[in-house]
Amino acid sequence: MKIIFMGSPEFSVPALCALLEEKDHEVIAVYTRLPKPAGRRGKVLTKTPIHIIAEQNNIEVNTPKSLKHDYEQEKIFALNPDVIVVVAYGLIIPEAVLSIPKYGCINIHPSLLPRWRGAAPIHYAILSGDEQTGVTIMQMNELWDEGDILLQRDIPIDEQDNIDTLSQKLSNLGSSMLIEVLNNIDHLVPIKQNANDATYTNKIIDFHIDCNEEAQVICRKIRALYPKAFLFFNDKRLRILKANYCPDSDLQNLKPGTVINSHMHIKCKNGVLIPLIVQLEGKNPCSINDFIHGYSISNSSIT
């Protein structure tokens, strides 16, 4: 089967690697996002992980800004793919492109659709305290994450999973499911999603920890937004990379954000946040014990 692969971030890598190991399938071209400026003054252009792997395997790489233009669609048509595989590509796939391959476009989506449609399904599964999540391989249509389900599998969410560890588990699961779908694509019966069960995600832009939230919710936020969740310690950003929590039945009168002891336990709504690994802006990550030995905790401001 001739395949065009569309993907960009690290999450896409296991799927592409799985395809490259298959003798019955050939990746004839890769589509990925444009290299981004990086380094001091943005003088270095950084290619996506998919771009790098494609070049290492002598696969044609395309980095269009959009697939809406006729000449981009004509290029895909000329490649004559049997199927297009889309994994966290980052561009909208127009209906004109969806209809080019014999088997259409199939997508690896890291949730149990129709739960958590949208851009941040793994984050939302952790934030919401879901006990399980999974991967859906779907037949793409012109609607956002509403295509028919070709295959779906679930996995448990471990209490210590953060966005990195859970993403890796789902990425690996999705890559094996992809091969199963491609090898059996003529025999699969697509299943329509139940729109009544749909839930949606939005791009996450707020990484600040609000101590007025419940401590358990804050711990989930730290895991879901790793390594970006932060609070302000004496007006400097302090990232909380790992934390635990406990009930606070004896501390109801304290204001949220209060540092309640020398271990830097922080009063929150209905609980106490127990930081374990932190990173002050401009510094390296460290254990909370190392942090409190280097900074004065008493009379500190936590917001």
From Swiss-Prot:
EC number: 2.1.2.9
GO molecular-function term, one example from the UniProt record: methionyl-tRNA formyltransferase activity
Catalytic activity: L-methionyl-tRNA(fMet) + (6R)-10-formyltetrahydrofolate = N-formyl-L-methionyl-tRNA(fMet) + (6S)-5,6,7,8-tetrahydrofolate + H(+)
Binding site for (6S)-5,6,7,8-tetrahydrofolate: 111-114
Organism: Ehrlichia chaffeensis (strain ATCC CRL-10679 / Arkansas)
Primary enzyme class: transferase
Lineage: superkingdom: Bacteria
Keyword set, alphabetical order: Protein biosynthesis, Transferase
Gene: fmt
InterPro entries referenced in this protein's UniProt entry, alphabetically: Fmt, Formyl_trans_C, Formyl_trans_C_sf, Formyl_transf_N, Formyl_transf_N_sf, Formyl_transferase-like_C_sf, Met-tRNA-FMT_C, Met-tRNA-FMT_N
Function: Attaches a formyl group to the free amino group of methionyl-tRNA(fMet). The formyl group appears to play a dual role in the initiator identity of N-formylmethionyl-tRNA by promoting its recognition by IF2 and preventing the misappropriation of this tRNA by the elongation apparatus.
GO cellular component: cytosol
Protein name as annotated: Methionyl-tRNA formyltransferase
Family affiliation: Belongs to the Fmt family.
Classification via Pfam families: Formyl_trans_C, Formyl_trans_N
